[in-house]
Curated annotation (Swiss-Prot):
UniProt organism field: Helicobacter acinonychis (Helicobacter acinonyx)
Principal localisation: membrane
One Pfam family per UniProt: NLBH
Protein name as catalogued: Neuraminyllactose-binding hemagglutinin
Gene name tied to this protein: hpaA
Segments of this protein annotated with the region N-acetyl-neuraminyl-alpha(2,3)-lactose binding motif: 92-97
Membrane topology: Lipid-anchor
């Protein structure tokens, strides 16, 4: 966990273009959480960069090739976030069904408990 410093440094003249995160999600991640996750990660990255003195411009695209010439010209850097978000079963909270060997299912009634693992990377281009 990165905790951005509460005091910010002097503002810089550089703009960083922050592309929408392009994540792949495992099938067991609920669809309504996908955008929430993308938005929270983008906001946290934006906060970190702003605390370092950069001006952040959020771009409504996840592909750097979609940027206009004007956007490329005004940007000092473009930040692209990609990776895979996987929800894995928690072995302590799941049991193996005898009729389906090797498969795990949740013992909860309507929710699956697990650990969210981000196997992504931050690529600066």
């Amino acid at each position: 966990n990165y905790h951005p410093a509460s005091e910010t440094i002097q503002a810089l003249d550089e703009n960083i273009l922050l592309l929408k995160p392009a994540f792949q999600y495992s099938d067991n991640v609920a669809k309504e959480y996908e955008n929430k996750c993308k938005n929270q990660i983008a906001l946290k990255v934006e906060e970190i960069l702003q605390n370092q003195g950069y001006k952040v411009i959020s771009v409504d695209s996840s592909d750097k090739d979609d940027l206009s010439f004007a956007q490329k010209k005004e940007g000092y850097l473009t930040l692209s976030l990609s990776g895979e978000i996987v929800l894995r079963p928690d072995p302590k909270r799941t049991t193996q069904k005898k009729s389906e060997p090797g498969l795990l299912f949740s013992t909860g009634l309507d929710k699956m408990q697990g650990v969210l693992i981000s196997a992504g990377f931050v690529k600066v281009t």
